[in-house]
Every structure is written in structure tokens, then in C-alpha cells.
Amino acid sequence: MKKIFVSLILIPVVLTTILACNDHKAPERVGISVDQFTAELKKGGFEVAQGYFQLWRIEDCPKSFEVMGTCYFNNPTAPYVMAVVPYWPNEFVDPATLGAFGATDPGYGATFRFDPNEAIVIFGFLPPKAAYFGLQSYLFTQKGEFQTNNATYDLIVKIGAEEVFFHKVPHNQARIGSFDSLSNSNNNVVIDRQSGGSFNQFRYFIITPDQYMDKQVRQVLHKLSVADKDIFTERIPSNMRFGLDADADDFASGIRYSMPDDGGKEGTASYKWRHNPTLTLLRIRDTQPHRLSRLYPAWEGDSPERRTAVDEWYLETDLNRLVQRVSQAWGQACPDPMCSGRAARFIDTQTPDFNLVGPKCDNIGMDCLADTQDASYQFRGGYGFDNDEVYAVVGTLGTATGNATYVSLGVNNFHLRLGAENVEGTKLVGSADPRWYPGVNNLGKFYVYYFTRHCEGLEELTHGFCLSVQDTELAIPPGVQATFVERDYMVPGTQRGPDSKLVLPPMVIQFQRPAQ
């Protein structure tokens, strides 16, 4: 587990200049120092403690699985950077969730209760330019029972995934796992639109359930000459169970940072930022006795920001025809126009009756698996790799249809609930070529990508668009089933992912590897 400690005592002007040049945009001012900010807060009678950040990687999955029975179906190309907070002296620490995101220093945790009179403040330089940056908080566990008398539960039972989405905390059966979003995220587009810049810029984030705390923190920042446009508040909704006692809700906050322009390999600026973010985390609370909190509105089913998309369903006939052409190319033709028995359509998780949307999950005690409105999620599960199976995933390419800034096509380990392998959208471009799949319209808007144990020897059929799925513990080991998942992130010109009901679900076709 990578522990990340940051102390921004003072940000030199020269660093500001270098970072600004990388983004071709000069920031308006240098950020404040930790000591300066802390001193002003304490003058106002606030208690202040400093936390740190911790990178959660695929390698950390086994420990998380021991604690929570899940690895959260992560996106392997965007490891979580988790906020690790110092516990308040009177805060209950649930031993059942300690280490949920890896070991932390004594007195610190990546999951925490919320004092109704507190705020978490994160500030500093954002990372180098990338396809996506987002900061979001989640309800992690709660006391109670999940509901089974609803259409969502019935659907999930039907596909055999009820233990994924409806479950108790393994070592505390009085609580259920949630991981439900609590707000619309503060992502790079939101930050750009409000402040005029995001990547490589100094910005401030307040996470709080209390309007009074938001106002007080902002007043201190204004006193330090911070412009209001550079401050972003995540409003934790009032329909959570606040408090520091054992019965209160448990929360988590994290950062997603995806597909940096510099490639993200070791030694790059983005790699360094991800492993040691130039951010500071402070936990702040009001010490006034008996002050009533001014809570924010509840987070309800219709609260998430409304999303748009280009309607892709006009491409359905072309998709079905492409599935036919792919099958013919393999000499394993479909039995009918829908390729029944061999091809299966992905499931859209965000529309009814699945409803993988934070407040809708919370209403029935469902685990939303760290959902976000910044992407659409479609999946299909129940596939093995032990008997020479070859799978073709055929779908629309969101970057070509106008529904995504970037696309992710992944393979999940169903047992560990782990995002094991991933194909970035740039590697899907050109995979649906008319030379290989003739007679299909709009091929430039599609992809065809293959998954099997060993791609070697299949080049004439896959044309190089193939991923060899490893049989290691943290990939898809023998006997473990896999799930395919497609994510479309951030519709161009908007600040959210696509309205998933307008996204044409991909299809997966199963073939048998040809005899040598």
C-alpha cells in the first residue's frame, strides 16, 4: 500500500510557473500555505487536524477482500486516490472496516463518521492534464437491512448478482455495504467552467454536511485572498445519519484520475502526482457547544444532474449486422438474425430496473459500487477462459458517436469484484474495418475487440485487436468467471457522462478457438 504524506508549507512561484507552462495557462495566483490556513482557522475557534492520501491499486485487492469481501469493481486504469483522515478523539472506529482500502497509520482511516459540525478541506495543485479528474464522496456502510421487495432486487437476483449488490459488512452483520454516491462530482469540467482552469491549477474543495461550516471556511479563504471561483463545495445531504457514534453512517472520499496526456508511466509528472499528490487534507470542526447544524437538502432519486447523449439506437440494425459478419468471419455463423444462443447484449446498470445511481441505491440498501454520474456503465457476466473460449465484444465507440471523451472496455474478476484488465478506447479505434466485416454501414462508429487466454495464433481473425487474459490471482484465474464492462466517460460539451438509456448496449459473442 502506498501512503502519501503531503505538507504544503509554501508553494514557490517557480513551481507555479512550471506547472502553468505545462498546461499552457497561467494561474491567477499562488496558493495558500497549510500553516497560514490552519492558523486562521484556529483563530476562529475551529479544531484542525491534518490527514493524507493513499493510493488504492489492484495489488491491494487481497487485503480489501479480506475486510469487505469486495474490491469494488474498480477501473484498473484509474486507481483510487483515497482521502485518509485523522479520527476525532470521540469518534467510533469500526474494526469491521479497518483496512478497507489498505492499512493506514494508527489514528487515521480511509472511512470515517461525519460530525454534523465539521468539514474536510482539500486544497493544492491539481494533476497534469488528463482525460478526467474527479473528486467525490460516498456513503460506505450503514446500520440496517437491505430491501428485497422491489423490482431492482428481483432483476439482480435473476442475473445471479444479489451478493454483489445486496450484502452485509462481512465482520459486522448489523451493517450493510453501500458505496453510494452522495452528490454530483466535482470533476475537471465542473472546475474548468467555474474557475477557468483545472489541471495544474491550485484549487480548494470543501466537503461538509453543514452550510454554516461551508460559510465559515469560505470566509477564512476569502480573508487569505482566495477567489470564490476557485472554491468548490461538496454538500453531504441531510438524509444521511451523521454523528460519531457506532450507529452513525460511515463515509469515504476519493479521487479518480484517468488517462493522463503524458501516458502515466513511471517517471512521468502524472505518475508522480498520483503517487504523491500536491494536495493537503485538513479535517476541521466547530468547537461551539450545542450549535445546531444547517443541513443541506436530501439526496433523492431525482437529485443527480440530468444527463444528455446522442441517441445511438439508430445504429442497432448495423450492430446486429456487424455481429453476423464477425460470426461469419470465424466460420461460426449465427443461427438467426439475433445470434441467439451465442451473442448476448450488455446490461445497462443505470436505468430502471437496475438503478445503479447513488440515491436510488441508498433508498433500498443497495451497494452502488462507487457509482458516478460522470460515466455510463454496461456489463455482461458469466464467462470463463478455461476451455479455449474466445469472446468478441462488439459495440458503439462513444468517442465516435459523440457520447464520450474517453472509453474503457474492461474484464472483471467476478469472485474478487475486481477490475482486472482494461482496454483503453484509443486501442479500439479502427477495429471494425470494412476489409474484415464488409456490408455493414457506419463501421467507423463501432469497435470489435477480442478476449481470450492466448491471442497468439489468432491474428488472421482478430487482426491484432485482442487481449490475452492472464490466469493469475489478480486477473482471471482458472475456475473464476469474468464480467465484461464498458464505460463511456464525459459527453463532450457537458460536465457529465451520457444518459445511458440512449447508449446502444454492446454485445458479446462467444467462439471456440479454431483447431490448429
Segment roles from a protein language model:
Residues 27-516:
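A compositional/structural signature for long, glycine/proline-rich flexible linkers
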Residues 12-15:
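Alpha-helical transmembrane segments
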Residues 22-24:
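Bacterial signal peptide processing site
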